[in-house]
Amino acid sequence: MSIFNKVTKSFQWGQHKVTMETGEMARQAGGAVLLDMDGTVVLATVVAKSDAKPGQDFFPLTVDYLEKTYAAGRIPGSFFKREGRPSEFETLTSRLIDRPIRPLFPEGFFNEVQVVIHVLSLNPEVEGDIPALIASSAALSISGIPFNGPIGAARVAYINGEYVLNPGKTQLQNSTMDLVVAGTEAAVLMVESEAKQLSEEIMLGAIVFGHEQGNIAINAIHELVRDAGKPVWDWKAPAKDEVLIAKVVALAEEKLVAAYQIRNKQARTHATRQVTTWTKMGLKAEGVEFDGVAVEGMLFDIEAKIVRSQILAGDPRIDGRDTRTVRPIEIRNSVLPRTHGSALFTRGETQALVVTTLGTERDAQRIDALSGDYEDRFMLHYNMPPFATGETGRVGSPKRREIGHGRLAKRALIAVLPSKEEFPYTMRVVSEITESNGSSSMASVCGGCLSLMDAGVPMKAHVAGIAMGLIKEDNRFAVLTDILGDEDHLGDMDFKVAGTTFGITALQMDIKIQGITKEIMQVALAQAKEARMHILGKMQEAMGQANAEVSDFAPRLYVMKINPEKIRDVIGKGGAVIRALTEETGTQINIEEDGTITIASNDSAKADEAKRRIAEITAEVEIGKVYEGAITKILDFGALVNLMPGKDGLLHISQIAHERVEKVTDYLSEGQIIKVKVLETDEKGRVKLSMKALLDRPSQHQG
């Protein structure tokens, strides 16, 4: 009799077999599911505190996706030989799981919840993110914690005009899209994607396809819950204090309506904070006992009602715009004198200073991924200091939000970058958000594109991004173009679209409510396209095309190709030749296995000298060609002649003169410069030379 009460569910999901198990591992967690998807195995666990902390006014959910190197049969490369801080992929996957599950916890549930996912085994063809999403959904669903799930998720590729469910890593290389969608049976909640300039129709089709396929996983989770689910918590949302709400409305509503007539963000924020202070003072004056956190929540609800009702009634938005207008745009290129490329992109009260730096291949980021090491020649880093919103706060290493925003901007630009053959530089773009009032990640896309073009990167097209919002009440809805920060907090959907005039390159969507239909998404995408075209027009006015030359302060890269068999000649014994070349010419030289050599230098003369010397070292001896060289050694049967650096040929005694030569030293001496003709080379690369082939044959005199 086993001590385990193990329950297993298996299902076929496209090309993959998926097995979910519970009851054997991590039995003390609130919920634990071991999921195997064709050899990629993840363990998702969920634990929730039984009570919320007193005074808690937000939902403390944490999601940690952790990859173990043993999953790929590897030992960590760090000094301590154990896993350290999360990689960028782990951070992004943690966010990917957090985003669709967070809206499904009931309003007023403030108990701490922690979801931890360990990747225990990895099939390089099956990335861990989709298995982790499904396992997390299953673990939450069987735990009994208040959760309006389960959710399903799927990855969608677009290959040869067809949607492909959960493609392998190799298949993805041939896809023009990499899209992840997650949602409940009824509604899409989250989309994260990159694409190679695809139309709105194709992207929407992928979302619908992925959502339908995700329901296969949801059905399997329902079966697991039926057989292994724990009792649902006896939890009820705290009863609302209707008397206190009425008093707060009476004290604050008119003042908040007036505050939301103020167009300037800073002044409006100051006014709403004053309303909060006055409301609390008014309640005290009336002798009402209250919890300050609860009152602030009530005021937020009033603000949301004011803003939402005004927009649905067709009134102007917070800053006076209608639903389709983009805020005023200002663009300035080459802002910084000594950087390789820079742009200042301002849209209303959101501003990004974006700077591009060009480097050599040695500057590429080496990524030690679980599925294999690789190099990344394009980096985009996003920073948002607290002063951007007029606040104080911690400054230091990037937070999850900053990593996520940087990745989104990178996804948007990567489709239009030149190939390595067209532009061999490593590129690093840094977006410094200097002001923020909504959509700073999309400002980073616009500024990033302009900054790259300013640096002389031959982009295939301009890329612009726009953040959209949605407010929905029953059958009424309004799609908002270029949302403000307040509209983001008070709205029902936040989605960001980036692309060119030809199509979408990145799409991110987060939906907070059920009932967003395909038709609503269609309207939103069409309105986003209209805004994107407007911004692209402004960008093209500011900078029609990339600068023809890179900055004077950027390294110049010169590429040449040699026979791969000659690489060892260029490197030399113990690296002596390449070291001497770089030191004597003042250049950086990078050699690839296929014989591609990249020379980096700010001085074209130095680069030309390095090229000339490499050409000499790698030159092939040509049969029939005449060379001038010094004799390096005298032999009994001839002499060795240096034809070019590192290449000698044999001048046989019979090829010195037309007459018979008894002693080589009668004709030649070491160090003597002579002209010789190449007769042949054998299969081992040995070269046979002749002097007499260049001499006139003596006349034959008859006596």
Swiss-Prot record:
Pfam families: KH_1, PNPase, RNase_PH, RNase_PH_C, S1. It is found in: Cytoplasm. GO terms for biological process: mRNA catabolic process; RNA processing. Belongs to the polyribonucleotide nucleotidyltransferase family. Its main location: cytoplasm. SMART domains: KH, S1. The lineage of its organism: Bacteria, Pseudomonadati, Pseudomonadota, Betaproteobacteria, Burkholderiales. It comes from Polaromonas naphthalenivorans (strain CJ2). The keyword Translocase does not apply. HAMAP family: PNPase. It catalyses: RNA(n+1) + phosphate = RNA(n) + a ribonucleoside 5'-diphosphate. One of its GO terms (molecular function) is magnesium ion binding. It is an enzyme of class 2 (transferase). The keyword Metal-binding applies. Involved in mRNA degradation. Catalyzes the phosphorolysis of single-stranded polyribonucleotides processively in the 3'- to 5'-direction. This is Polyribonucleotide nucleotidyltransferase. CDD domains: KH-I_PNPase, RNase_PH_PNPase_1, RNase_PH_PNPase_2, S1_PNPase. The gene is pnp.
